[in-house]
Curated annotation (Swiss-Prot):
GO MF, one example: protein-cysteine S-palmitoyltransferase activity
Official protein name in the record: Palmitoyltransferase PFA5
EC numbers on record: 2.3.1.225
Chain segments annotated as transmembrane: 16-36, 53-73, 156-176, 194-214, 319-339
Enzyme class: transferase
Pfam families: DHHC
Gene, per the UniProt record: PFA5
Organism expressing this protein natively: Debaryomyces hansenii (strain ATCC 36239 / CBS 767 / BCRC 21394 / JCM 1990 / NBRC 0083 / IGC 2968) (Yeast)
Length: 411
């Protein structure tokens, strides 16, 4: 559902495939409800068992369709347009945003920029050609449901996976129970619809269970599919480069995309800025299973906002509630919205300066960093393992020499 063939890159395929899925569900309904449920179980075994099959499968399918609709209607989450940072301390701030305490950048210290949206890119934001805007916490485009999965609809995607998986598990259980009796009843053959059901159920149980397990792993580490793909690219590229060492046999396979896993963060340090290097395996956005899980279900899949400012937000009671939202369908639709909406900063309504207002808006969407990562960055600064941004290059030499022995500010 994530790693799509090249065919899925075409716009027409993205429209046709969800329709094919719906038509496929229609056939599966015929095979389950009529061929298995009525012609076999209801007529030759038990009316009650047949009714239980119909009720359970109908409930699962209603959940699948409901969460599919929620996926599409809710959308992945649109990133706000952030004007360029005031890196050069310009007096004309009409089209600029104050520089935040930290932002992710390239090796030279410049923030990432989306040329299509004409905006600073927030962490883990990616521009979607299908939506024509940048997606918050972009995960992937799912061709099977026909929409982008991002920050806002990610939890509905997990619910969709659960109930789609349950649908096929229930189908396979009933099917395996009554296949032999269908075969033994005189014809020594089975209904050909059963063969199709076995193939489809086996295939989708394998795909959906693997995908659900992978995404639960992502939630535990507050990762995205893009993060995981980049980490795997690092391993492939490292393996390829080691195989192509001059002392070894050449690797004749296709050269993988270069990915070292090295990233950079631009941080306010004393009266200047510094660039610190880290790697993808440092997981700057992971706050541990308990917080990551509750941030997904109780804080709209965000690591910022008022919810994260209070330790009481991460109580055992709320952890239990978050599991309830995960396992019980539709509870999240009626759960009190005070923990689900984006909470605005109180100062936002009292600030007269549009310039300062832009920074507050940016901070509302900027991902927080975990303490372990901040300690790691601060330790690197203490050890002078940093360099100056290129836009401050005339001052770089003086700042580097004056920073020796000084204590870095905490972020």
């Amino acid at each position: 559902m994530v790693f799509d063939p090249k065919l899925f890159k075409y716009a027409w395929a993205k429209r046709v495939i969800p329709i094919c899925v719906i038509l496929g569900l229609g056939y599966i309904d015929f095979a389950c409800f009529y061929a298995l449920g009525y012609r076999e179980i209801y007529k030759f075994h038990s009316h009650g068992v047949a009714i239980s099959l119909w009720v359970i499968l109908a409930w699962c399918e209603v959940c699948v369709i409901a969460y599919w609709v929620l996926l599409v209607v809710t959308g992945p989450g649109k990133a706000p347009r952030v004007k360029p940072f005031n890196l050069y301390s310009s007096e004309d701030t009409s089209d600029l945003t104050p520089v935040p305490d930290y932002f992710f950048c390239d090796e030279s210290g410049y923030p990432f920029w989306c040329s299509q949206c004409q905006s600073i890119k927030l962490p883990r934001t990616l521009h979607s050609k299908d939506r024509n805007y940048c997606i918050l916490k972009f995960d992937h485009y799912c061709v099977w449901v026909g929409t982008v999965i991002g920050q806002r609809n990610y939890k509905y995607f997990l619910n969709f996976l659960i109930w789609f998986l349950m649908f096929f598990i229930v189908t396979l259980i009933y099917l395996s129970r009554y296949t032999k009796s269908n075969y033994d009843r005189g014809t020594k053959d089975i209904d050909h619809n059963y063969i199709v059901l076995y193939i489809l159920s086996g295939y989708w149980i394998l795909i959906l269970s693997s995908l659900l397990a992978a995404h639960l792993w992502y939630v535990v580490h507050n990762m995205t599919t893009i993060d995981d793909m980049n980490i795997k690219k690092v391993k492939r590229y490292s393996r390829w480069t080691s195989n192509n060492d001059k002392t070894k046999r050449k690797d004749v396979r296709k050269i993988p995309g270069e990915e070292t896993g090295i990233r950079y963060i631009n941080i306010r340090y004393n009266d200047t800025r510094v660039i610190v290097q880290y790697t993808l395996n440092d997981f700057p956005f992971s706050f541990g299973f308990k917080r990551n899980w509750q941030n997904l279900w109780l804080n709209n899949n965000r690591t910022n906002g008022d919810f994260t400012q209070h330790e009481s937000s991460y109580s055992r009671k709320r952890l239990a509630i978050s599991f309830l939202l995960f396992l019980v369908p539709y509870v999240d639709l009626v759960y009190p919205s005070r923990e689900r909406i984006n909470v605005s900063d109180v100062e936002k309504s009292t600030l007269d300066s549009l310039y300062s207002h832009r920074l507050i808006e940016y901070e509302q969407y900027n991902d927080r960093l975990n303490d372990k990562f901040l300690d790691y960055i601060n330790s690197k600064i203490k050890n002078n393992e940093f360099h100056m941004p290129r836009y401050l290059s005339p001052l770089a030499e003086d700042q580097q020499s004056s920073s020796e022995g000084s204590r870095p500010d905490n972020i």
